[in-house]
C-alpha cells in the first residue's frame, strides 16, 4: 500500500520547503503542483490566450514531464523563471479555468498513482488525491509568508520589493479561496499546522509523527 502525503496551504506557507525536506528524509518522491500551474500559466500568458477554446488548443500542444525531480515543457527544462511574483499571478489567473485544472490534475494523478510520494499544492487533499493516506494543511500569516518569499527571491538574485511580494500573497489568497473551481480549503481530515510560530525543523517533526504513525515508512535521513 503506497503512502501518499498531501500537503496543502496558501502561497508562501512553507509547503515547498517542508515537502522537499520531508521527501528527502523519507527517501520518497516529491511533486510541487504549484510549479506546474506556474509553468502552464506563464506559457499561456506568453501565448496571449484567454478563452477556453484557445486555451484548449494550446494545451493540446503541451507535453509536461516530471523527470528526476525536474519539470520539462515540450522537452525544455524549467528554471527559476517560474518563481517570480508575475508567474504566481499568471498561475492563479489560469488556475481558475476548469480546462487547465483538469489538464494538470490528470497529470498529477498519473504521477502520484501507486507511489510513496509527497505532493504539495492547494487542492491535493480535496481534489487530486482525496484518499491520500496523510493530509496536512499548512498555514502562516500573510506577513510571515511575504518575508519568507521575499528572502527566497533575493537569495536567487530576483529583484523585487517586499511590498510587491506581500501584495502578491494577498492577491493569491483572494484568488485561491474565492475561485469557483477547487478553491483552497482545508480537507476535513487534514492535520492543521500554523508554521508562523514554528521553525521548519519543528514543522517537519510534527508531520513526521503523523506520517510514521499512519504509513509503513522509515526515516532514511535524520
From Swiss-Prot:
Pfam families: Cytidylate_kin. One of its GO terms (molecular function) is CMP kinase activity. InterPro entries: Cytidylate_kin (IPR003136), Cytidylate_kinase_dom (IPR011994), P-loop_NTPase (IPR027417). It is an enzyme of class 2 (transferase). GO terms for cellular component: cytoplasm. ATP binds at residues 9-17. Its main location: cytoplasm. Keywords: ATP-binding, Cytoplasm, Kinase, Nucleotide-binding, Transferase. It comes from the Bacteria. This is Cytidylate kinase. It comes from Thermosipho africanus (strain TCF52B).
